[in-house]
């Protein structure tokens, strides 16, 4: 269950994995695209998980129609704005919305820097209108290779003062982290923090590399840490957080069942893990589902869920004063 007197955070939430079906339909028709279906229920299986996919890459293909309809920068601005509204509707107090501008720009050859600016504008407008706090994390999509990631990083850094961190996401097996060491030197020089998708499709070695060579202070998913007790101890000792996404890990077949998800073991080791959605529109879930449906299936106790909610704020890329302000607001509810 969610404790209302504590801030509720979602730190691992892909903006480009949370494009409403209604918006896909609307923008698809606006730009004259050949969609696989032209009503919401017929379109749903093409853009939302119906049953577990065999792999991460198969899961990610469900995101493709969402970005395919981004025919201009106004469309990018719209989906960013709607993402903030969706977070508000899920009772989230603070969201870190991550996005890949290369992926969003690709279908219609949009300017990457323009996509970044449009997303920044949309999120800022959403925060003003909906009264929640949100920050942005820029993604480099490793799936498209080193050169594409450099283009993506260049675009992201044009708005570096509007971002809190940079992430590396996508095909972890085909494009390992050691190909992106130089990219993350630039991230460090820009004084941005680092979170990396690791230990999802690849093993614990991918997480060590993300921490030691890329500078990750948080890890997205990180389920394979369970294979390496020394890594578990290191995560706990050095306060490196795990952004856990329970339903996503089932739907990508990263974890075989809720019962076998390692988050409970992470908490028992003292690893700071928090609950997040990942790609809510694609998964057909929202953050309350993770606390109220997925977490009990994993076997998390009320005390562990409270700790998870506390961890979410502790791990947020916010100043101490910003965190305290969120605590003060929640305490009055």
UniProtKB/Swiss-Prot annotation:
InterPro entries according to UniProt: A_deaminase, A_deaminase_dom, Ado/ade_deaminase, Metal_Hydrolase
Enzymatic reactions: adenosine + H2O + H(+) = inosine + NH4(+); 2'-deoxyadenosine + H2O + H(+) = 2'-deoxyinosine + NH4(+)
Active site: 200
Record: residues binding Zn(2+): 12, 14, 197, 278
Annotated Gene Ontology cellular component terms: cytosol
Signal peptide interval: none
EC number: 3.5.4.4
Any one GO BP annotation for this protein: nucleotide metabolic process
GO molecular function per UniProt: 2'-deoxyadenosine deaminase activity; adenosine deaminase activity; zinc ion binding
Cofactor binding, note field: Binds 1 zinc ion per subunit.
One Pfam family named in its UniProt record: A_deaminase
Binding-site residues for substrate, renumbered to this chain: 14, 16, 170, 279
Cofactor(s) this protein requires: Zn(2+)
Site (Important for catalytic activity): 221
Alphabetized UniProt keyword annotations: Hydrolase, Metal-binding, Nucleotide metabolism, Zinc
Domain of life: Bacteria
Similarity comment: Belongs to the metallo-dependent hydrolases superfamily. Adenosine and AMP deaminases family. Adenosine deaminase subfamily.
Function: Catalyzes the hydrolytic deamination of adenosine and 2-deoxyadenosine.
HAMAP family on file: A_deaminase (MF_00540)
Family annotation (PANTHER family): ADENOSINE DEAMINASE
The protein, known as: Adenosine deaminase
Organism: Aliivibrio fischeri (strain MJ11) (Vibrio fischeri)
Annotated gene: add
């Amino acid at each position: 269950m969610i404790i209302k007197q504590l801030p509720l955070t979602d730190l691992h939430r892909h903006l480009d994995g949370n494009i409403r079906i209604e918006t896909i339909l609307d923008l698809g028709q606006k730009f004259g695209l050949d969609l696989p279906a032209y009503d919401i229920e017929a379109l749903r299986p093409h853009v939302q998980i119906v049953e577990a996919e065999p792999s991460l890459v198969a899961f990610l293909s469900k995101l493709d129609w969402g970005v395919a309809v981004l025919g201009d920068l106004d469309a990018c601005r719209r989906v960013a704005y709607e993402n903030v509204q969706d977070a508000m509707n899920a009772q989230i107090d603070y969201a870190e919305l991550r996005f890949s501008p290369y992926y969003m720009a690709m279908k219609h050859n949009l300017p990457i820097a323009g996509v970044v600016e449009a997303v920044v504008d949309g999120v800022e407008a959403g925060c003003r209108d909906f009264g929640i706090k949100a920050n942005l994390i820029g993604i480099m999509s490793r799936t498209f290779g080193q050169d594409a990631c450099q283009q993506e990083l260049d675009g992201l850094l044009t708005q570096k003062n509007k971002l809190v961190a940079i992430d590396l996401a996508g095909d972890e097996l085909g494009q390992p982290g050691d190909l992106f060491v130089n990219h993350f030197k630039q991230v460090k020089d820009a004084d941005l923090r680092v979170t990396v998708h690791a230990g999802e499709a690849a093993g614990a070695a991918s997480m060590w590399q993300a921490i030691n060579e890329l500078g990750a202070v948080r890890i997205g998913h990180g389920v394979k840490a369970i294979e390496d007790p020394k890594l578990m101890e290191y995560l706990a000792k050095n306060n490196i957080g795990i952004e856990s996404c329970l339903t996503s890990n089932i739907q990508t077949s990263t974890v075989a069942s809720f019962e076998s998800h390692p988050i409970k073991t992470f908490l028992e080791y003292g690893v700071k893990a928090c609950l997040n959605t990942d790609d809510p529109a694609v998964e057909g879930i929202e953050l309350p589902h993770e606390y109220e449906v997925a977490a009990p299936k994993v076997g998390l106790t009320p005390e562990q869920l409270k700790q998870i909610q506390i961890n979410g704020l502790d791990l947020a890329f916010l100043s101490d004063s910003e965190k305290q302000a969120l605590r003060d607001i929640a305490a009055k509810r």
